[in-house]
Amino acid sequence: MLSENTTILMANGEIKDIANVTANSYVMCADGSAARVINVTQGYQKIYNIQQKTKHRAFEGEPGRLDPRRRTVYQRLALQCTAGHKLSVRVPTKPLLEKSGRNATKYKVRWRNLQQCQTLDGRIIIIPKNHHKTFPMTVEGEFAAKRFIEEMERSKGEYFNFDIEVRDLDYLDAQLRISSCIRFGPVLAGNGVLSKFLTGRSDLVTPAVKSMAWMLGLWLGDSTTKEPEISVDSLDPKLMESLRENAKIWGLYLTVCDDHVPLRAKHVRLHYGDGPDENRKTRNLRKNNPFWKAVTILKFKRDLDGEKQIPEFMYGEHIEVREAFLAGLIDSDGYVVKKGEGPESYKIAIQTVYSSIMDGIVHISRSLGMSATVTTRSAREEIIEGRKVQCQFTYDCNVAGGTTSQNVLSYCRSGHKTREVPPIIKREPVYFSFTDDFQGESTVYGLTIEGHKNFLLGNKIEVKSCRGCCVGEQLKISQKKNLKHCVACPRKGIKYFYKDWSGKNRVCARCYGRYKFSGHHCINCKYVPEAREVKKAKDKGEKLGITPEGLPVKGPECIKCGGILQFDAVRGPHKSCGNNAGARIC
């Protein structure tokens, strides 16, 4: 069962709160079909937060302390469900060859297999388990080990896909738990709202409809909200010509305006009707303009304050319309970087100052089967073309998705952003690793779907239909939590730990790198500061504090807890644990 804060993607593309979903309504399934809701149940149970693991760290360090808005990880995938709710989990099956023994005297092959396991309350569940097999360290032994690996790869496949209840996740060992992933899926069907508005038919996706979607994306990226005016890079003639051609389809012609001081960005107005034969003062700019009607009537411009936004119906539009719309945003405000070879190497970044546009970019990207993350930058002063510019708080939307991203770029018209259409488009679910944490008690709802199909949440996460295991409170009984924690930061679930100041493997890779570079750590909260944070603490001067043993100590102040930073002049295997250089015992 799912928390009352959960949103559901309905069959018509609408995103609805689960509390408002009724029996006999239709939801969007993972395979693109619509399925009827047979029954809706309600209860009050303990819930767990299933949350995407990310590399966002701004909320942990100095950026989050200086700017409260950067403490939020925007558009992080998550769902709240009960302990008895089943998750569709995937783990890799790739066997590994490594050396074993005190002096590496044997070859060891580590592999995984699905097998039965009995829980502490007597249930039988099927989960993957780690196994290993040893071979002598000889030429024959190495050959036999490689043959065994090939046999395992043929018989096991690339991944194990299995269903597991949330309360049983602790029965996976640490390595399996870290590599476990759930998925979100693309939206394969379209609601056709834009097509219906432009052509009168929701199933009609013509080149004219796609050209309008592209112009709407271009307008949302860089334009004024007062009139149909778009800023275009004057050094990109292909973009200007493409805008002229797409506008002509809708009976629009362009006029280029310039500032008092000529700039690289030119203001292009979209007038309706034939171009004037002579210079006249009155032109159809907003009156009868089909582009401006789409902007205002379909709510791309908010009514109350006139701010730009991406309306929710665009999240579930036809795939071609979504791709053309996103391409317009990329042409206007996006960057395309190619790293390595192959279609998977394209990385797309779109910057915006509007939170509603950021939400729309992420939703549309995920609905096309692409991964999307958001980083932030605080308000700042920058110098652009020799001028000081006050930049607002910015959202950086980063998108990647293999052939799906390349197909989006094929709709772009900017000369250096457009790419060829890929020969094959693989629109598949995207997997992500996750953590699970207890949240408390809440009102929960369970949806029973016809055919027990998997359906999509509002954030595109694929979930299973509720069955008998969801009814009633399910006890979570397990021996221990297998995920490890870094002692210096909140990070958990990481594979490898490194030696800290005590000589034990207790810190993650980032904190280990900081400690190795700066040599400082807090004696109270064990936080490892960055070099710039150490410099600021030293500039403030030393302060008097108390060690955990109750002794007075003097040193730089920890900016996180107000404790004392200790400096270890010698780090590594030759460090003496009793060395307190930099934090003087008084």
From Swiss-Prot:
The lineage of its organism: Eukaryota, Fungi, Dikarya, Ascomycota, Saccharomycotina. Its main location: nucleus. Residues 215-370 form the DOD-type homing endonuclease domain. One of its GO terms (molecular function) is DNA binding. GO terms for biological process: gene conversion at mating-type locus; intein-mediated protein splicing; mating type switching. Initiation of mating type interconversion. This protein is a site-specific endonuclease that cleaves a site in the mat locus on chromosome III. The double-strand break is followed by a unidirectional gene conversion event that replaces the information at the mat locus by information copied from either of the two homologous loci (HMR and HML) that reside at the extremity of the chromosome III. Endonuclease expression takes place in late G1 just before cells enter S phase. The keyword Transferase does not apply. This is Homothallic switching endonuclease. Disulfide bonds: none annotated. The keyword Nucleus applies. PROSITE patterns: INTEIN_ENDONUCLEASE. GO terms for cellular component: nucleus. Rapidly degraded via the ubiquitin-26S proteasome system through two ubiquitin-conjugating enzymes UBC2/RAD6 and UBC3/CDC34. The metal-binding domain form zinc-fingers that are involved in binding of the DNA.
